[in-house]
């Protein structure tokens, strides 16, 4: 299957058209609607390649319903969005607006609802779609509009399009970077299991094509586990770091900020800040190329592979990163997996369930460190709870929703059922979406990540649907995929898809996998292995795996947009290799090199074609 949306790649785009855009200051207070209880909603027209519903009847019917309703509202939505964008091509969100700005921005807000084209719109016909952008298909139900959002669902889609040139510019005072450094030394520097969850203050400008969005007082903190580094090395040279951005941080928690806690004089403005989102996101992650993938797109391509299998996966894009005017090179930007993520992909009836991040931990259910590290193997002795990063308390299953109300009963029931020696088909299907599971495991096999649910019992999310209580899995942190072996050489291209072993060569521990898709599958669940085999066959016949063409097309688009900024302004203290664009690889390079995508694809297809259940 070809990668949707790659035809007619735009090539290199200009990121600065300031002379052609109008500058409007929209204050936070004006963004607070006087009709907050308005039941209006915006239609999320996300293309099928950009959003991936689970393959269940409920989700399919929701998609169909949304498509029918969108026919009535698509013209209105596109007109309103077009006018809003023409006004807000450069949008500045101020932390504490003046009354004058509030009045001006209220006028802008009102005028933006009038369906008249701007001067730039008169030069083209908005209703005609460029050939490079296929007609989007609505695949998700509506969610309520957020009057405090910047950019909306249209920006959400454009932000992660590989064809668009994106830049993230962070402006942060030295006093704040010093606090980031102190946060690291206070927590992670003494115990690698701990890390600070305190956000420091920065201003942010995001450019998408020729549109620019500036947001004041964005929260920023460093992120990562073993990859987490201090902001500065001991010699004062900057490290290249990964970051988490928060768009709704209020900076007024005295326990976290002490005497520097922000004092809000306008309660309305504070409430607006708590609801502020950017491109419908509460947060956004920024990660550097820690595995030195010279194609710079493998994780993005893998996400497209999962989408083609109708598996839930976060949106991932590329962006230039600069901090205080210094070019930090090319990074990846990520949609977080949270309530917003689920709302975009599942029908309303499925929302409200428990969401868990599944990782390695040495904690028991009491939050005590046992010294025995283990992955999320789905055994009954795995731990679960609400993590506390500042205390280094993490569980195998870290609850991300319903933190105050959940009794974890869905998870406990799930673990008990899948670990029964004589579990029946009816019992398993009561707690597991079998069709979705087969698709998830098939796509995971071809992605070839040695650090995933099957090979290292790590890096995925587990969600229990509210409507039927069934478990589905969500892809996460696939940065070691499609032939990336740098730092962890467990070549998954040679693994039999039905193997009873993990990539570590140890016997498979996950009871779901053992019972359903391996050589050890019992007669009771042979039908699941057949579903898995069918999904493997479907994926193996798609253009994404039978040819390098789609991958090379995406690569050339990324290279065209970002080759000029791939080299950072300085060699970072923790940088081990140069950053570059290249399709070359070395499959015999050990853990200091990556095989090429061509080598990986060829090898895993050879392994698959010669395998037998």
Where is each model-derived feature located?
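Internal "kinase-insert"/substrate-recognition segments embedded within catalytic cores
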Residues: 249-252, 268-283, 288, 309-314, ...
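Conserved oxyanion/phosphate-binding beta-strand-loop segments in alpha/beta enzyme cores
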Residues: 204-288
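Extracytoplasmic intrinsically disordered, low-complexity "stalk/linker" and propeptide segments
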Residues: 47-51, 56-61, 65-136
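A conserved alpha-helical element in kinase catalytic cores
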Residues: 290-311
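Middle-to-C-terminal accessory/interaction subdomains
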Residues: 144-149, 165, 178-180, 391-396, ...
